[in-house]
Amino acid sequence: MEWVRDETPENAVFSHWWDYGYWVQSIGNRATVLDGGNAIAYWNYLMGRLVLTGDNQADALEFLYNHDATHLLIDSSDIGKYTAFSSIGSDKDFDRYSWMSPFVMDDKQTQETNNETLFFYPGGLTLDEDLVIEDSGREVLLPKGGAGIGAVVVSANTQTNQYQQPYVIAVYQGKQYRVKLRYLNIEGRFIDFGSGIEATAYIFPRLDNNQGRIAVNGIGTALYISPRLMRGMLAQIYILEDPLNNFPNFKIAHTQSSLIVEDLRNQGLDLPEFVFYQGIQGPIKIWDVEYTGNEEIKQEYLDKDPTKYLDWKL
């Protein structure tokens, strides 16, 4: 919070998930859109729906404009909280509800052939929405809540030193399906393969403590960023750094690495912002919010009574 307190104007207004309110107000000494006491549930809904899981920049900017927000803050604990704010930000059919969980490489299952190395990341994740795939020339429905992801698989061509299109192993009713993903983010590169489901395999380092010595596997952990997550703002700008340029008016202003990553860097390790060590370690990121000039005041975003706009109870 030192940067917030010392490097932003005194009249700055910070937007973030509600439970950071007291933190920013008391330590950063800045105003916030959402209150740390969870006082206005409807605004939490709007923040969850239009910003954190929002699928377009215009809605996010208009909500923030109505609350005079100058900055957006996201912390790595929001990855674990995604289930909470995506549920709160959903409609009555839970259209934004989703979750993230790491898939950790099983070194013993790494397979090498003459020209390919196959990296296997086992795990378990239920589908957050229906997925229709093609299998042996026919369409197959993998239903949300019933089907799941059992592993993420990434391969590299050892002759060209190029990564190949990743896929996940989906499981439904005892049968496994290989489902190709369109995107791969690995070693600082975002690769678009042009086909596959609109999902990303996000690969980042795993750190192992072996008798007091830290060993780094630079591609040791995977996140499966589902199509639903990929439509959301948090995954696009916080994890992937807006590779599709869908949120250009959010300009990164400050990145504060996690204390664990900072400490390990001070010990000589060259680490990116995200690592897997005693859980996912990631930075605090803060963006300047630059408005387009097309935003308008909407009473719907200022009201505190959701019953005027929603036909279900938050």
Residue ranges and their predicted role:
Residues M1-L314:
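Extracytoplasmic
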